[in-house]
Amino acid sequence: QAEVRTVLLDCDLRRPSLARMLGIDGGMNLGACLRGDQEFAATARRIGPNLALAANREPALDAGEVFGGRYLPLALAAVDETFAPDVMIFDTPPMLLTHDLMSFAGHVDCVLLVAGAEMTTVKEIDLCERELATQTNVMGVVLNKCQHIGDGYGYDAYE
């Protein structure tokens, strides 16, 4: 939707990848912004008429402390004031590998849980969904990296 102002934040500070994937160079340092050391406007880059990206080019050694820190709510408020986005999307690290998301989840309106097919069990998805629901609203679950398509899928199944 072209009219929707969106801010995409690469909150996987341990293994940031969005700036690199999108071919954006420069001194992006979302960790410094979330620590209160840098203004959000100096961190973010517009990559379209209604899309801004904030990321880290290099891993942050203190990622756990950043998300549990006192500046996080202030930094998120600054994002809202600076860009007035309709939607903010936070790409976070895998929930089962770090506690970053649980420290962060209470500061967002909702989450969309993304699970890797053949990597994440139903039991793990259920556990993550229940834990997230204690902090915020869970919109749903997306199954990612799915390679198998069953016989009953597609238009041929209607014949």
Regions found by a protein language model. Give the residues of each.
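Conserved beta-strand segments of the P-loop GTPase G domain that flank and frequently precede/overlap
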Residues: 9, 55-56, 86-92, 113-117, ...
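Hydrophobic micro-sites
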Residues: 126-159
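P-loop/Walker-type NTP enzyme "switch/lid" segment
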Residues: 4-84, 94-98, 102-106
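Switch/connector loops and helix/strand junctions flanking conserved nucleotide-binding motifs
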Residues: 16-18, 62-64, 122-123, 148-153
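Conserved Switch II/interswitch segment of TRAFAC-class P-loop GTPases
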Residues: 86, 94-97, 108-126
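Residue-level marker for beta-strand->alpha-helix junctions and adjacent short loops that shape enzyme
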Residues: 13-14, 95, 118, 146-148
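Short alpha-helix adjacent to the SAM-binding motif of class I
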Residues: 20, 78, 123-131
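Short glycine-/polar-rich loops that comprise or flank the Walker A/P-loop
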Residues: 2-4, 108-110, 135-139
